[in-house]
Amino acid sequence: RLYTSEMYSQNADILKADSFKNISMTKVIYEKYTERCRKADAMDFDDLLLNTYLLLKNNPEIQQKYAGMFRYILVDEYQDTNFAQHLIVSQLCKQHNRLCVVGDDAQSIYSFRGANITNILNLSQSYPNLKTFKLEQNYRSTQTIISAANSLIETNKYQIKKNVFSKSSVGNRIPVIQSYSDFEEGYVVANQIIATKAIQGASYE
């Protein structure tokens, strides 16, 4: 949702929902936070996105200026974009409609900070003439690792179907390590690296 503090305070549905969740102070906090930012001539990252979107949306002459300036737009890691970023890109593409995005829906791991996977899953709805090029060969991992990853990913209800493969060696079986904390996990992995170096004479590189 893209709401300024003023829009938030005037939205009856939001205020009702906040009251139901016993978080009515959200409105007051947002207003005071916005006031402090304005007094300091400051914006946080969310403000930058929100105000950029509103600037383009509410000022056609500015939107046309920048949409005309950027004839080609490339966005990397599109699976990690949020709602505001998706709308900003849409505003900038209105004139030339030349957009190239790179991304992997199977690597969307930042929803906790606002990333919206539907941006990449539903991209063809926003751009009906979209062409998709699937880069399915993996050059980094063995086929054993790729097969294990595929077996997990194929259960995703919403995804862009891919047949990822590797032409590298089959590779060793994947060991399963059970640990009770991140510290224990790090300890086990570090000791395994030390043991591998001692036994096989392997390099840390």
Model-flagged regions — what are they?
Residues 18-122, 134-141:
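Conserved helicase NTPase motor core
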Residues 6, 12, 47-49, 113-116, ...:
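Solvent-exposed, flexible loop/coil residues
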Residues 125:
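Glycine-/small-residue-rich beta-strand-loop submotif within the FAD-binding core of flavoenzymes
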Residues 1-13, 18-27:
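Upstream accessory/linker segments immediately N-terminal to the RecA-like ATPase cores of bacterial MutS
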Residues 1-10, 42, 152-162:
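Proline-centered turn/helix-capping motifs that create local helix->coil transitions or kinks
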Residues 11-17, 69-71, 105-106, 165-173:
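Short linear capping/connector segments at secondary-structure termini
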Residues 14-20, 60-61, 129, 198-201:
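Short, glycine- and charge-enriched coil/turn segments that flank and shape catalytic ligand pockets
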Residues 128-131, 136-205:
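Helicase P-loop NTPase motor core
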